[in-house]
Structures are given as structure tokens and as C-alpha cells.
């Protein structure tokens, strides 16, 4: 009893010590151990505790090659190498600018925190280890099995609670982790060309031409600003020599009523800068969806753009005239009294000034062209809106009010979409256009579309006519019932197929799947637009309207006859 008590004391103590690492109870034992029999088990020392061994710390070297099992001749790791290295720029920031990820095993040893908290006591000997062998023998062989047999299901290693970062630093990333991700299908060349055409198709229109002209105007405006600014030092020389007064006392009468007070280069720079800012605003606005969807549908914006371009044209024309006048100093360079060797530098026209004059007049011409294109855009949009209005007037039945859906709670946590009750949108019937005077050239009268049964089955005037209408109604009603049942069956089948088509994947995983789904959808659309089915559907709708018209005529006649009988 005493022996049992003495042996149970250390065992309970070990259990209490291992109680802090209870999450390692699912670690499997080492499957690789030498074959033993009953006699060898009797000769071995049993462990002091029945608890499973804690997993050892992760290896210091990569698990491949001869370097995984270091030799005993290597120098031990010093305490300085165990300190964490703190860098001014983290390695995660450096990896952003690298195209290829570095191998974690290539990092220096000091960057890997390979220490482990371990357990406060030394582990007991394994039952598979012979008692005759020393405890430190075959350490290298044991490290092979131990390092590869224990795996922590909780994310740690060696009894350490914060060893997840050690595992991330030591083990490389899973090379097969990307196989589970959804692969993106590569677009074909034709699909990319179609997408490009859809995105930039508006550049072929008059609005796109305006955007191209804006880009050219920005380049010319920048050239004007640069060329004019390059020779602004001549203005300082002029004001330093003559000030703000007329040189040599020339009066207005001698100049023919003209007075030149000095260079007007600031005015030219202000004109170029203002035009550049307005042009870049027009360019950015024209590239937006707001311009294409809202502004082009308005009646005032094309005319506003025309006014802006005309204003900039006038400003550039004024700036060009002022700058040309500055090059000959208001006509003073044509007088011999002023054009002396001392003042020759003021009358000399440099190459940059000539380029500035050319750019000024070309920019003026570009803004005039933009104004004309704006007028053309205004006429084009007006014609487009008129065509759309005429198309809506010719086909009023094809326009249906939008169906507004709203969510309704069922009470069990589910929501369904039901059509919201809306006010009936009454159709506004357009009155026929009345033309007074002569018929304008190119006028096409609008045809009046009327079903044939309206003119054929007019108001009933006699009893035999009523019987004839009734016979036609009974004869074609059977055909209508048969067609209606057939069309309704097909429409029900189509509604079921629509629900199935909605469940098809929108983003297939590969190109083969994408082509297969596209082929199925194409065949389905072909079935829905089959001429035979569409003809039956049209015939059913026609018979429905015709029979309703005949029935209305019969009811009107019966009402009149009942009224006459009651009166008599």
C-alpha cells in the first residue's frame, strides 16, 4: 500500500503539471518504433506518467536534404542570436515591391524565433527505449521520428501557446493552397475587342470628336503658355527703360489716334490659362457617364457648349491680336526715330514668339471648329430624340410601365417579392398633326393602323346580321380555345425553363464550361423565338381581340333591342 502511495504521488504531480497543456491530449503516439515482444517489455523501465509526450519544438533547418540533420560539430547557438531582430522597415513592406516571394528557409537564423516555451520538467523516458541504453544515445535517430510524428492540432508546438508565428516562419506556404480557389476565365481576343468597342464606341460620334478637339486644344494651350512665358523678360526690359508712358513723347495725333502704353503679355497669359482650365473641365465632364446620359438628352447643353467654345474663340482671337501688336510695339518699330540700334532688341521677333503667334491662331481656329461641332451635335441629338418620339408614337403598345417590386415578410423569417400597387398610367393619345398651307417637302403622312375585323364587323342593324356574327363567333371560338391551351402549355414550360436557366453559374470555372453554358442559352433563346410558336401566339392574340370585338357588337345590339322592347 505504501509503495502504491509513493508511486501515485509523482504520477498525480505530473498530471497536475501537464494540466496546463490539456489541448495536447489528442496527439498520437509515435507509430514508428522497433518490434518488441513480451520479454523485452519486462526488461524496460516504465515511464513515471501515463500522459502523452508533449510535441518537441520545430526543427531549425528545412525538412529536406542533408542539412535537416545537423552534425554535432556545429557551434551551439548563442544567447545573442536568440534575441528578436527589430528592423526599421518590416519585411512584409519590402515584399510588396518584389515580384516573387522569398523562400522562408532562406532567411537568416536570427530572424526566426525558434525558441519554445516547452514544459517545466524534463520528459520521461519512452517505454520503447531500452533501459540499458543511455538517455542521450541515438538522439539523432529519435529526432527523426519525433520531429515527423507529432503534430499539434491546436496550432502550437512543443507545449508553447504562442508558437503559431514560429510555424509560419519555419514552414513554407502550402503550394497547393491555390488549387481550391476559383480560377478566372481568360477572355478571348474577340471578347476583348467587343468590350473595347462597347466602351469607346461613343468616340466615333460628334461628342467623341469634341473630346478629341479638347485634347488638341489642351496641348496647344500648354504650348502657347510656354512660348509666351519664355520671352516675358522683354516686358521687364521695356518697363525698365520706358516705364508706363509713351516713348519719345509720341502723341496720339502722331500715331493716328492710337496709343501704345506697353506690352500686354499678362493678358495673353490669363486668356491661355482660363481657356486651358475651361477646356479640361469640358474634357473631364465629357468623359463621364453624366454627360452621355443626362446632358446629351437635354436641349440646352449643346447650345451651352457652343456658347463656351465661341467665347473661348473670341478670347483667343483677342489674345492673338494683342500679342501680334506687342511684337511690333504698337507700330513703333515702323518709325525710324524709334527703330534705332538701341531699341532693336524690342523690335526683333524671336523664334519662340513666332511659334506663340502660330499656336495662338491655331488654337483660335480649333475653338471655332469645336463651336461648329457643338452645333452639329445639337442638330444630331434633336434628330435622334425626334426619331425616338416617332418610334414610341408608332408602337405605343410596346411600352409597358415598369413593375415595382417590394419585399413582404412572411412571418417565418423569409421575405418574398410582390408587385407593388401602382396608379394606372393612362396613355396619352397624341392627336394627329394638322398641317396648314402647302405640304412641306419630304413630309411622310403617318399611316393609320387598324385591324381588319373593325371594318368588317361593324354595328349590327338586323337580326340576320346578328345570327351571322354569332355563327362566326362560335366557329372561331373553338379554334381560339385550342390555340390558347397550346400556347399556355408552352408558356408554362418556358417559365419553368427560365427558373432553371437562372440557376446556371454566372462565372464558370473554365473556358469549356463557359462555352457549354453559352451554347445552352443560345439554343434556349432559339427555341423561344421559334417562328412556329410566335405565329401561333400571334394568331391566338388576334382571335382573342376579334372575338371580343364581335361579342361587343352582339351585346350592343342586344342592349338596343332590349331597350326598344321595354319602350314598346
UniProtKB/Swiss-Prot annotation:
Domain spans labelled OCEL: 451-562
Residue ranges, Extracellular side: 233-266, 325-354
Coiled coil: 462-559
Keyword Coiled coil assigned: yes
Positions on the Cytoplasmic side per record topology: 1-211, 288-303, 376-568
Ranges of compositional bias, category Basic and acidic residues: 29-46
Gene3D superfamilies: 6.10.140.340
TM region positions: 212-232, 267-287, 304-324, 355-375
InterPro entries found in the cross-reference section: ELL/occludin (IPR031176), Marvel (IPR008253), Occludin_ELL (IPR010844)
Keyword Amino-acid biosynthesis: no
Keywords, sorted A to Z: Cell junction, Cell membrane, Coiled coil, Membrane, Tight junction, Transmembrane, Transmembrane helix
UniProt region (Disordered), positions on chain: 1-72, 116-163
Location of the MARVEL domain: 205-379
GO cellular component, as recorded: bicellular tight junction; plasma membrane; tight junction
Membrane topology: Multi-pass membrane protein
Subcellular localization: Cell membrane; Cell junction, Tight junction
Pfam families: MARVEL (PF01284), Occludin_ELL (PF07303)
Pro residues bias: start-end ranges: 52-62
Domain of life: Eukaryota
PANTHER family: MARVEL DOMAIN-CONTAINING PROTEIN 2, OCCLUDIN AND RNA POLYMERASE II ELONGATION FACTOR ELL
Similarity-based family: Belongs to the ELL/occludin family.
Biological role: May play a role in the formation of the epithelial barrier.
Identification of the protein by name: MARVEL domain-containing protein 2
Gene name, Swiss-Prot/TrEMBL: marveld2
Amino acid at each position: 500500500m505504501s509503495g502504491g502511495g509513493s508511486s501515485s504521488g509523482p504520477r498525480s504531480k505530473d498530471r497536475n503539471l501537464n494540466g496546463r497543456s490539456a489541448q495536447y491530449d489528442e496527439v498520437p503516439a509515435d507509430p514508428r518504433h522497433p518490434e518488441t515482444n513480451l520479454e523485452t517489455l519486462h526488461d524496460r523501465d516504465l515511464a513515471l506518467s501515463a500522459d502523452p509526450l508533449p510535441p518537441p519544438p520545430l526543427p531549425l533547418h528545412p525538412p529536406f536534404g542533408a542539412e535537416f540533420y545537423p552534425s554535432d560539430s556545429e557551434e551551439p547557438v548563442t544567447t545573442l542570436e536568440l534575441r528578436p531582430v527589430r528592423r526599421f522597415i518590416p519585411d512584409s513592406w519590402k515584399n510588396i515591391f518584389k515580384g516573387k516571394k522569398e523562400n522562408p528557409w532562406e532567411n537568416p537564423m536570427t530572424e526566426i524565433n525558434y525558441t519554445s516555451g516547452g514544459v517545466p520538467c524534463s520528459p520521461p523516458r519512452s517505454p520503447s527505449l531500452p533501459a540499458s541504453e543511455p538517455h542521450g544515445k541515438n538522439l539523432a535517430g529519435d529526432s527523426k521520428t519525433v520531429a515527423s510524428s507529432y503534430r499539434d492540432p491546436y496550432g502550437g508546438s512543443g507545449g508553447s501557446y504562442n508558437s503559431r508565428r514560429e510555424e509560419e516562419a519555419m514552414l513554407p506556404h502550402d503550394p497547393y493552397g491555390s488549387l481550391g480557389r476559383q480560377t478566372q476565365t481568360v477572355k478571348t481576343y474577340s471578347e476583348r475587342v467587343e468590350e473595347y468597342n462597347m466602351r469607346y464606341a461613343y468616340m466615333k460620334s460628334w461628342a467623341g470628336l469634341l473630346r478629341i478637339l479638347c485634347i488638341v486644344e489642351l496641348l496647344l494651350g500648354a504650348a502657347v503658355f510656354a512660348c509666351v512665358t519664355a520671352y516675358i523678360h522683354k516686358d521687364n526690359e521695356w518697363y525698365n527703360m520706358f516705364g508706363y508712358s509713351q516713348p519719345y513723347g509720341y502723341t496720339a495725333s502722331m500715331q493716328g489716334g492710337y496709343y501704345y502704353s506697353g506690352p500686354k503679355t499678362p493678358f495673353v497669359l490669363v486668356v491661355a490659362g482660363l481657356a486651358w482650365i475651361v477646356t479640361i473641365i469640358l474634357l473631364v465632364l465629357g468623359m463621364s457617364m453624366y454627360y452621355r446620359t443626362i446632358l446629351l438628352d437635354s436641349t440646352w447643353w449643346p447650345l451651352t457648349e457652343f456658347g463656351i467654345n465661341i467665347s473661348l474663340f473670341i478670347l483667343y482671337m483677342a489674345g492673338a491680336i494683342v500679342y501680334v501688336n506687342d511684337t511690333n510695339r504698337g507700330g513703333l518699330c515702323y518709325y525710324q526715330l524709334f527703330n534705332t540700334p538701341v531699341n532693336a532688341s524690342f523690335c526683333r521677333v524671336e523664334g519662340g514668339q513666332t511659334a506663340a503667334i502660330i499656336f495662338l491662331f491655331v488654337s483660335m481656329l480649333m475653338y471655332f471648329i469645336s463651336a461648329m461641332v457643338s452645333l452639329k451635335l445639337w442638330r444630331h441629338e434633336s434628330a435622334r430624340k425626334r426619331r425616338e418620339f416617332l418610334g414610341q408614337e408608332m408602337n405605343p403598345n410596346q411600352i409597358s410601365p415598369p413593375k415595382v417590386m417590394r419585399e413582404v415578410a412572411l412571418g417565418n423569417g423569409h421575405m418574398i417579392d410582390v408587385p407593388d400597387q401602382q396608379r394606372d398610367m393612362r396613355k396619352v393619345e397624341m392627336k394627329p398633326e394638322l398641317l396648314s398651307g402647302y405640304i412641306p417637302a419630304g413630309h411622310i403622312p403617318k399611316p393609320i393602323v387598324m385591324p381588319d375585323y373593325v371594318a368588317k364587323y361593324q354595328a349590327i342593324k338586323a337580326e340576320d346580321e346578328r345570327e351571322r356574327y354569332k355563327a362566326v363567333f362560335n366557329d372561331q371560338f373553338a379554334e381560339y380555345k385550342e390555340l390558347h391551351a397550346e400556347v399556355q402549355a408552352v408558356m408554362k414550360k418556358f417559365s419553368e425553363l427560365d427558373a432553371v436557366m437562372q440557376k446556371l453559374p454566372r462565372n464558370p470555372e473554365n473556358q469549356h464550361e463557359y462555352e457549354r453554358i453559352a451554347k445552352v442559352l443560345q439554343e434556349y433563346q432559339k427555341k423561344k423565338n421559334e417562328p412556329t410558336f410566335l405565329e401561333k401566339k400571334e394568331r391566338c392574340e388576334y382571335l382573342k381581340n376579334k372575338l371580343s370585338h364581335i361579342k361587343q357588337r352582339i351585346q350592343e345590339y342586344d342592349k338596343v333591342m332590349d331597350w326598344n322592347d321595354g319602350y314598346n
